[in-house]
């Protein structure tokens, strides 16, 4: 019954037939589940009827003698090569839902990464797109890769996320984009939660949203990595049904799947099964059991065929992989498929995505300019920061509360000559607090955003420079407001000179130090392979910066062989600038009630702190150089990370 239903889908009845066929075969379903499947049927049928999607060429992918090897051992001592994929050949056609299966470690994800263009170095063989050698940048624009983990920005609503995707990927009028987004959300059953933030979506909704985001520009090729991972059976059925519908709409849909249920297994059009990096079966689903039977492997009557082939590949019935490898290499799969279903798998003459005779050469340029991408990404990043309770609200409140606490602790000491060292302690702590308040939130959040950036950039949403400029500029207003709020509290409460120019310089130095610290946080976040690494490296890098700041040890007392380290401490220039701002600029004598006050004259304070010869403009200049250098270095690290992904 299920087989007939699948054939009906091929004839154009829509994947809803699958839902009804399986339901009738399994017996009477509870009314709630029946209603749910009815809704799924309606949504999936709609997924084939997109009217506003841009027209694209249908794509067939062929790979010949594909192999992949990696170097073993650490970078300083390579021990040779390890081959992960060996001599894979085959063809994935339009209008087909292809499942790549195999036990853990078989090479499924590696194989799909190579097909998608995410891995290049170490690959041998040939990949053809519509019979021509693949041009990677062009292919990346006509394909999309939906990863196993649905990395979404948590503070955007479903509709906002979709509009960002549409604005980046399409050059149409805004009304057309809105109609397209509405059509996709309706078809995928997400319209009811269009104003819900992505962090509050269920697993199935997140997966469908990840598909919807990539569907905006109607990619002819779609790659899915373990799309059913972590989902319940109903959500798994929805996702696979949706993929099948997208495939039968004229796309080539390829997914890795570990061990599907029998119901999901029958929904695939073709299988490509791997074991130990080699192919042990390729062909239509219905041909798997007869093919294995011809090789002397009999699947038990009530056993899930997907479970059986995984057990065979894992060696539970003996080491049969060499025999299966040879059978595929000798063309037994192809012969068995032609024998069992002659002419059944021929492609339809017309593809609704785009007439095959057009087959245009697509450009690899982006749909929008770099400036447009920057504006869209700036707005998205700014909105995300504004809505982030931890990153923004807590950060703002911490500056207010710490400012009040410090103001009370150092109340009215700024003009007291007997408390000069207390005041310098206040100035140093201000630099310390502003540094960590800017450094750590960036260190903690940027690695989490890296996964979203990598997915969107590799799926050709935008350029690296547009993203980085938007990320750099969007947080600047917050890095200005928070230090100014802190300075406005502590400067006056601690009784510093009541001069507007000194207050403005004090605030400017605080802002400059915070921006440099944030730049260092971006660099650490971009270079770190995980959040744990970033969390450790962030505070550790602060230790030498503080140690050579000039507060704990003056420059003259630092050993000669370590004095160069003092020039690399950006806190030194911020702290030095604050000392010059408070006690320099020809400030008059300080108030002192004691009989002896050696620090009544501010020049003595400057001499004691070894900043008498320092220039305030040089401190600003060096902080500016630090800011630009760290931002540029973070950009280069991001660029390297993107290239290393391939």
UniProtKB/Swiss-Prot annotation:
Pfam families for this protein: ABC2_membrane, ABC2_membrane_7, ABC_tran
Stored CDD domains: ABCG_EPDR
Gene inactivation effect: Abcg4 deficiency does not significantly affect the levels of sterols in the brain except for brain lathosterol levels, which are slightly elevated. Abcg1/Abcg4 double knockout mice display significant accumulation of 24(S)-hydroxycholesterol (24S-HC) and 27-hydroxy-cholesterol (27-HC) in addition to the cholesterol synthesis intermediates, desmosterol, lanosterol and lathosterol.
Tissue/organ expression: Highly expressed in the brain, in particular in neurons, microglia and astrocytes. Expressed on blood brain barrier endothelial cells. Expressed in the spleen.
Membrane side Cytoplasmic: residue ranges: 1-393, 447-472, 525-532, 639-646
PROSITE patterns cross-referenced by the UniProt entry: ABC_TRANSPORTER_1, ABC_TRANSPORTER_2
Subcellular localization: Cell membrane; Cytoplasmic vesicle membrane; Endosome membrane
Residues annotated for ATP binding in this entry: 102-109
Membrane-traversing stretches: 394-414, 426-446, 473-493, 504-524, 533-553, 618-638
Further remark: Whether ABCG4 is an LXR target gene, is still under debate. Studies performed in monocytes, and in one astrocyte cell line indicated that ABCG4 expression could be up-regulated by oxysterols and other LXR ligands. However, subsequent observations in a number of different cell types (primary mouse cells, oligodendrocytes and neuron-like cell lines) have not confirmed this observation.
Function field: ATP-dependent transporter of the ATP-binding cassette (ABC) family that may be involved in the cellular efflux of sterols, in particular cholesterol and desmosterol (a cholesterol precursor), to high-density lipoprotein (HDL). May play an important role in the removal of amyloid-beta peptides from brain, in a process that can be antagonized by desmosterol. However it is unclear whether ABCG4 can directly transport amyloid-beta peptides or whether peptide export may be facilitated due to changes in the membrane lipid environment. Induces apoptosis in various cells.
Protein name: ATP-binding cassette subfamily G member 4
Organism: Mus musculus
């Amino acid at each position: 019954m299920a087989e007939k239903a699948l054939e009906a889908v091929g004839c154009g009845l829509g994947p809803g037939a699958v839902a009804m066929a399986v339901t009738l075969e399994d017996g009477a379903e509870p009314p709630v589940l029946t209603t749910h499947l009815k809704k799924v049927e309606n949504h999936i049928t709609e997924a084939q009827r997109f009217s506003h999607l841009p027209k694209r060429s249908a794509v067939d992918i062929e790979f010949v003698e594909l192999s992949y090897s990696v170097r073993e051992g650490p970078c300083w001592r390579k021990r040779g090569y390890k081959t992960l994929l060996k001599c894979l050949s085959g063809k994935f056609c339009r209008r087909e839902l292809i499942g790549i299966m195999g036990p853990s470690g078989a090479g499924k994800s590696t194989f799909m990464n190579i097909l998608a263009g995410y891995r290049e170095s170490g690959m041998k063989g040939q990949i053809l797109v519509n019979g021509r050698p693949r041009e990677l940048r062009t292919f990346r624009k006509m394909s999309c890769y939906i990863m196993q983990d649905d990395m979404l920005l948590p503070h955007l609503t479903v509709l906002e996320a979709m509009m960002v995707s549409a604005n980046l990927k399409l050059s149409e009028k805004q009304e057309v984009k809105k109609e397209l987004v509405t059509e996709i959300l309706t078809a995928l059953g997400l319209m009811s939660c269009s104003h819900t933030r992505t962090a509050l979506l269920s697993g199935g909704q997140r997966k469908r949203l990840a598909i919807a985001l990539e569907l905006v520009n109607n990619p002819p090729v779609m790659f899915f990595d373990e799309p059913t991972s972590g989902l319940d059976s109903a959500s798994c059925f929805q996702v696979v049904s949706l993929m099948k519908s997208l495939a039968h709409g004229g796309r080539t849909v390829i997914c890795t799947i570990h061990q599907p249920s029998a119901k999901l297994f029958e929904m695939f059009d073709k299988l490509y099964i791997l074991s130990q990096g080699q192919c042990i079966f390729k062909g239509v689903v219905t041909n798997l059991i007869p093919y294995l039977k011809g090789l002397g492997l009999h699947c038990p009557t009530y056993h899930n065929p997907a479970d059986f082939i995984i057990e065979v590949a894992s060696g539970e019935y003996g080491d049969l992989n060499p025999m299966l490898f040879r059978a595929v290499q000798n063309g037994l799969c192809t012969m068995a498929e032609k024998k069992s279903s002659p002419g059944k798998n021929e492609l339809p003459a017309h593809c609704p995505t785009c007439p095959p005779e057009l087959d245009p050469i697509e450009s690899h340029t982006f749909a929008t300019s770099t400036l447009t991408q920057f504006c869209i990404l700036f707005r998205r990043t700014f909105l995300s920061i504004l809505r982030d309770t931890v990153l923004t609200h807590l950060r703002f409140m911490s500056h207010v509360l710490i400012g009040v606490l410090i103001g009370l602790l150092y109340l009215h000491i700024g003009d007291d000559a007997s408390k000069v060292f207390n005041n310098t302690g206040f100035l140093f702590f201000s630099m310390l607090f502003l540094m960590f308040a800017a450094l750590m939130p960036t260190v903690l959040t940027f690695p989490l955003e890296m996964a979203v950036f990598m997915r969107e950039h590799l799926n050709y949403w935008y350029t690296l420079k547009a993203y980085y400029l938007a990320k750099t500029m969007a947080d600047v207003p917050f890095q200005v407001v928070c230090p100014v709020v802190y300075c406005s509290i502590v400067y006056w409460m601690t009784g510093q000179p009541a001069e507007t120019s000194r207050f403005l310089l004090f605030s400017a130095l605080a802002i400059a130090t915070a921006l440099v610290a944030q730049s260092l946080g971006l660099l650490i976040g971009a270079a770190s392979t995980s959040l744990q690494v970033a969390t450790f490296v962030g505070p550790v890098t602060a230790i030498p910066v503080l140690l050579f700041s000039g507060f704990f040890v003056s420059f003259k007392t630092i050993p000669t062989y370590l004095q160069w380290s003092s020039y690399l401490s950006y806190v030194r220039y911020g702290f030095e600038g604050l000392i010059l701002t408070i006690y320099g600029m020809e400030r008059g004598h300080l108030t002192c009630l004691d009989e002896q006050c050696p620090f009544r004259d501010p020049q003595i304070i400057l001499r004691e702190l070894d900043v008498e010869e320092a220039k305030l403009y040089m401190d600003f200049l060096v902080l500016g150089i630090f800011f630009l250098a760290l931002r540029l270095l973070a950009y280069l690290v991001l660029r390297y990370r993107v290239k290393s992904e391939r």
